[in-house]
Amino acid sequence: MKHLQVSTDPRRMTTQVEEVAAALACAAGRTAQLLRSGLDPTAQVPGLTWTAAETAAHLVADLSEHTAILTRTYHAPGTAGGPADQRNAAERGAAANRAQLGAFPERDLVVLAGLIEEAAAAFNTALAAQPGRGPVVTANGVRMDPATLVSVLLGEQLIHGLDLARSAGRSWSIARADALRVIPGMMAIAGDYLDRDAAQDLHVSYELRFGPGDRYRFVVDGPTATATRAEGTHGRPDCVITADPVAFLLVGYGRAGQWSQILRGKLRAGGRRPWLAPRFSTLIARP
């Protein structure tokens, strides 16, 4: 699929990446503060198979892994597969996550809090040292440019921070501005996570609208999908989804049901075939 970029101006691109990196550091600090607040490390995270400690360990391992990928010191565990690997990115990602946790045994939440802050700082240092870096290939075989990678890692931090808070019945907020920083990364790799079974024989174009200047076209053509910025896109889409950015993030990561967000007016459908809107969330596989 075509990988999105936020801007074609290198100076603007650098500024945007720095902005997302700063948001990542802030989110990591919030996560660390939560981990130091007396959470039960053995508490089950709602909706996941992980405990709070395992979720925190995943955040550390994931940041460290992507730092190693950026600095070319990463040694793949063999989960990405080769050309004959028919698994989608979500299935390969689940295998990579299992390998991560198996190789990283730390489960003390206070220790993990410090490690999350250190890992986020190390990632941002590696990111800043390579402003012109081209795409890298992650453990699940997905190609990402640095802007996409830092955006995706911010999403991981925000969503798993929510998971940790929910394990203890705590509150956790996600700002609209942060959701808008994550969405470009989500859209850039959405085609890699296409559920081929769900998309079989489907030919549809979606336009996703999050506000002025934040519109994307997602075109599904059977077993493949392409995401592009909607600005300058020719032709009318089949279905238009106007979404609150935070609601889209929560539904996209499987942390909220789409119907609850629809009833709250956070997701609205339009276009020539609006009945296709509820199907959109079923097209993206999750690890």
Give the location of each predicted region.
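An N-terminal domain-cap segment
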Residues: 9-57, 66
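Short, helix-capping/interhelical loops that line the mouth of catalytic, cofactor-
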Residues: 2-19, 64-133
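Short, contiguous alpha-helical
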Residues: 39-88, 137-195
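Acidic/His-leaning functional-site neighborhoods
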Residues: 214-240
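A glycine-rich beta-turn/hairpin centered on an aromatic-Pro dipeptide
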Residues: 182-222
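C-terminal interaction segments
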Residues: 233-287
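Hydrophobic packing residues in well-ordered alpha-helices of helical domains and bundles
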Residues: 17-24, 52, 109-116, 150-153, ...
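Amphipathic, well-ordered alpha-helical segments in soluble domains
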Residues: 27-31, 62, 119-122, 126-129, ...
